[in-house]
Every structure is written in structure tokens, then in C-alpha cells.
Amino acid sequence: MVCVGIDVAKDKHDCCILDSDGMVRADCFTIPNNMDGFKQLLQTIRNCTKKSDKIKVGLEATGHYSYNILGFLLDNDLAVYVMNPLHTNLYRKSLSLRKTKTDRVDARTIATMLLSDADLKSYTDTAYHNEELKSLTRYRFDKVRERAKLKQSVSRLVTILFPELEKLVPSLHIASVYALLSEYPGAKQISEIHLTKLTNLLTTASKGHYGKEKAIQIREAAKSSIGSVMPAKSLELKHTIKLIKEITSEIDEIEDSIRQIMDELHPPILSIPGVGIQSAAMILAEIGDFSNFESPDKILAYAGCSPSTYQSGKLTNCYAHMEKRGSRYLRYALYNATKYVCHWNPVFSEYLAKKRAEGKHYNVALSHATKKLVRLIYALQKSGKAYLTAA
């Protein structure tokens, strides 16, 4: 067996190759982070190995810096092991009392760790899908938050320019309202529209839901509005609505990509009533390989959903709060999914009602339901069975 340790950096990578006896096949060498460097690494590995040798390549999970070399190694059918930097750091400290940390030392540490740890799992196609899902779901999460902030800006601007409008429609954030405010961003502009033109605009944008009656209501309200006439705010409103439409289009595109991956994976978690594709994708992406977790409690701890513990002498905390450490994305996805599951799944609905009847606050009761959901997800993903079959 031959082990290759790679310390990944932005512009270059340090490498070390050891055999199964810990002897150096290729002392620490540096390659540039480009195709020539990748080919140099591959050629060096081939020069140091025989056809019968089993090759293991290890590198740290260093975010985007490792993506390209990882893809190159996988394309060349090499078994790659992605390691937690915390684990490699602790392992390096265990090898020596000296406080020595260089890229070359790290490369050799990774190679040595490959030799000593037989339980390491190689990077697989499933891991690739998880990385893709993680990138997409986190990107979507950020885009949704960005859109939410813009919607708050729309509400603020409408309060200044045409405050009466909010009482005439179920929501400011619907297609008909956006179409109206994109063309006429203020009470003064709306009050001067010809009724027929306003009716046609609302009818088209609402797909027939609104007609002449709603147009009359809005125009009359605009004529007597207390809204300010501020061209700068009107321009800001138009641009904000335009940005919301663009981001919504981007979110739709992201969700299509997520849906394609989920169609390939077809995970058992989707069989749970109330768990949608987007929530399921984020949960799977953040958890990754379920075999890395010994129990559902480990997943809860990873998500930061476990209660904190504090004890000092005779003092023990009576009202433990959530740790809220770990993956905030996973925590968000689990709580969001739990709300829908409690609505659509009678078992969870009854469980939530039971906890509420015990006098627990809604959020506390929901956290109990989240723990129940995590136990169910863990069981389904480990067994590979659908929810109805498992029940």
C-alpha cells in the first residue's frame, strides 16, 4: 500500500508519499495549483508505485481550495480520503512535542494518518452529490435571505409612498402589486392612471383575479392618500422590485438543479409527509454520510439542537437552552421541516399537541418534535426504507 499526503493551499500543494512500512517513496515536494502541477503529481505517484500497489490519497477538507485537485484525482480513479483538519491537527501534535507546523510537515502527517487509520472512508459519488447539494442549498439559503431583506424594503417604501395600498390587497408581495408598483411607484402616479389602463394591468398581472372593482378601489385610495411624493424613493422602489424578480428567477434555477440531484438520489426521507425537496436536500447535504453518526443524538448535537448543560458545585441549570452551535443550516432545515411535518403528519401533529398540553412553550414543543423527526430520518436513511414501509 502507498499513501499520498497532500497539504492543500491556494497557489500550491505540498505532497509526501510513504509506503506501508512508513518509508519515504517520495520526500516532500511542492506542485503548483494548475494542470501542469496536477500532472506532475500523478506522474510522481506512478513512478513510486507498482501496478499491484493499493494507492490511498489523503487531503484536508479546506473548502474551495481542494475542489479542483480532488476532482482531478477522482477522474484518474484514485481512492481519495478527505480528512477533518481538526483531526489531522490533533494527530500531528500527538506525533511530536515540538510546536512545528509547516506545509511539508502537514503533508507527511496526512500520509502517516492514512497508514495508521484503517477506518477512514474514501470519497465517493455520494459524497460528490452531498458537496453539490451543500453548495446549492446554502446558495439558495443566502438568496432567500437576500430576497427577504428586499421585501422588507418594499414594505418600508410603500409605507412612505402609498400606505393605504397594504389594506387593499392580501399581501404586497404578489405579482399584481409588483406589476402595479413597477409601473407606477407611488400614490400620485397611480391616482393619475386612466381607469381602463389600470384595470387591464391588474387583470393581466393577477390572471383575472382582480378587475375593474379593485382598480377603482386602488385609484380612489391613491387620490386621497397621505403618501409622500418622493421621486428618489419611487426610483428605489422600482429597482428593489426588479431585484426581487431577478433573485426569484435565480432561486427557481437553483431549485431546479437541486431537484435534478434529488431525483437521482431519491432518498427515503422524501417519503415522510410534509418533508419537501428543498428541506430534504439541505438536511441530507449538511448531514452527509449517516454512517458517520453513531446515533440520532449525534446528529442533534451536530446541528446544535441539544440542550446545554451547566453544573458548578450544587448549582445545576434548571432551564437548559439549546446549544445553537454546529451547522446553522442543518438547524434551520430541521426546524423548518418539523413545522410542515407537524401540519401534514397526524403522528407528529398529535405529538406536538401532547407537548403543548403539558404546558410547554411552542418552540420547546417544536424542539421535541424535531428530535422525534431526526430519529425517524436516521432510521429511514440507515435502513433505506420508505416511511410507510417502515411504519
Where are these regions (language model features)?
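A detector of single, family-specific signature residues
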Residues: 1-391
